[in-house]
Each structure stands twice: as structure tokens, then as C-alpha cells.
Amino acid sequence: MKKSAWLPAVIAPVVVAGAVAAPMIANAANDPIAGKNPSAAAVIASIAESSDAQYSGKLEQTSDLGLPELPTGSGGSSLEGDASDVLSLLTASHTARVYVDGPSKQRVQLTQQLAEQDLIRNGSDVWTWDSKERTATHVTLPKEAATPQDGATTPADIAKQAVDAITPSTTVSKPTEVRVAGHDAWQITLTPKASGTLVGTVRLAIDQQTGLPLRATVDAKGQDDPAVQVGFTSLSYGAPAARLFDFTPPTGAKVETKDLSDAGSHAKGDADHHRTDGSRAAGAEPTFTGKGWSTIAELPAGTVDQSSLGDEASGLLGQLTKSVDGGRAVQTSLVSVYLTDDGRVLAGAVPVSALVAAAK
């Protein structure tokens, strides 16, 4: 595994935090809410004000998911080494520099052990760069056409719909004042009503002046330290230097190019979901069962090609997972994953027992 894999590993906790709170992030707009006693809906509505924000900052991500540790040694297989890298990336703390100039210019920069990895977006051009491996990827994004939104048209309407969508399964707290990276923020706490989820609470801190989300914290039940926390430790508003969003691969770098600008490529992508051996590729879309915080995602049979794992991976699976009825599973403090004997994959913020029951 190339070290550029830090990118999904760092982003994964952000996705977790964002996914469980996604209903709260409505496409809304509002005036700054500093100096008031706002409702949760008003704080939610203010988030859209940050869509055009310009800022530079330092972002810190920490995870305490209770993932198993793999023994290291010279005799380990390459797959075991890859898994060790992934686990290290998921469990260790990471600090990244973030530069944002509106919705179409962003740069995330991670520097560690004299190496640098970057994700750079400038309009439709996206680059990733790994200085240690000297590899770069250039992706051309499709041009997005503006799509009018149906339904609610005012911030108040949209915010009300967002709150109404989650209140059946979630208790939403009254905003409280906190300070993050030197900025005053409103913090909202979301608490699942269901007892079957591993999620204890989700806390979102939102800048009082700009609506920019400054910190997201996901707490697991029965655990004192946050399972996932992503937040700014320093933040300065203002347009970053334009040169930060320009990138030219150094001489001798290995460059991979992917052009997604043609809308017709989606058809090819759908076809690629099916392999010639009948199994499903990673792009196969999941189905969902359950509701709210107890939702379970399932990828179909053939998603995991177990025959390709072979003897080399058997020891790896044994260390990462435990044997359960009908397959193997791993449960972290926040998320469980179940690999069935027929190659299905089930995952959710629920105990393994719930996944096993859903698979039957």
C-alpha cells in the first residue's frame, strides 16, 4: 500500500462524523448568529454561509476506535504490512494544513517524517501528490450543472425540515457556547434515541460569525474519550495565496490521469461494477435496512472475493476479525463490519449481532 493511502484514512473519520450528522447539514443560509440565543435550526441554517468562505488553518484528527493491533516483524506478509499501515493511519493522530478559497479551490496538506502528501482542487482539476513515493494523480471532474432545489426555498423552511427529519430518532440540544481555535462557536449535541446504536452523541461546533463548522466529535457509548474528533486548532480567515492551488508534478514523477469530465463515463463505471467472474466490484451500490442511527448498509454477494484472499490473508483475517455465525466480523467502538461466507459485506454503527441478524 502506497503511503498516499493516508488520504482516505484521514478522511474516513470525517466521513463518519459527517454521515451520522448529515441530516443536520441542510442547504440553507442565514445571517451570522453571534450574540443571540439561537435555536438549533438557526445554527443549522447558518452553515450554508460558509460555502464561500476563504481561510487557512490547521486541522487535527484523532480516533479511538478500539481497533486491534497487528504484531509487526520482518516475517510479516505484504498484506499484513498493508493492514498495519491502515490501522496506524486510522488510530494515530494526524495534523493537516487546510487552505480553502470558496467551493472550488481547496488544498489539504499532510507533512510527516520528511514526506508530504497533498490533495489539491482548483476548479475541475484535482491533484494528489505523494512526495515519498513520487507519485501524482490528476483527475478532471465533470462540470456540474446548477440544479434548482424543489420544496423549501427559505432558510427557515430548510432548517425546519432538517430538524424535523432527525427528531424522530434524535434528541437535539439547545446550542451552547464554546470556543474553538480562537473563535466563538455554537455547539449542538445530537443524542440518538435508539438503544441499539454504538453512537453515544455527536457534537458539532459552528462558528458564530461565519457558520463554518469548526469541530465535529463522535462519542461512542461506554467510552470516555471521543471515538472520532476532527477540528481546527488554528484558523485564519482570508483568501490563501493563489499559488497554493496550482500544482505541477516534479520531473521524474509517476503521473496517473483520470478524466471524468465526460458524463458518458458513468455508464462505463456502472458496467465495471460487474466482473467477468460474476462478482461485484467495489463500486456496487449498497442496500439499506433499519432506520436512523441503527441503519445497516449491505453490499451484495460477491463483493468480497474470498478465493482471492488465499493463505496469505488467512492470518490477517484472523487477527483483524473474529469468527461469528456465517462469516467473520470486527467491531470497533463506533462501527461494526461483517463479512459473510457468501461474500456479502454488512456495516453499521451497531453491534456485530445486529449485522448477523440482518444478514439472515
Which role fits each region the language model picked out?
Residues 109, 177-252:
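Gly/Pro-enriched, hydrophobic low-complexity segments
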Residues 244-344, 348-359:
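Accessory, solvent-exposed terminal regions and/or long lumenal/extracellular loops of proteins
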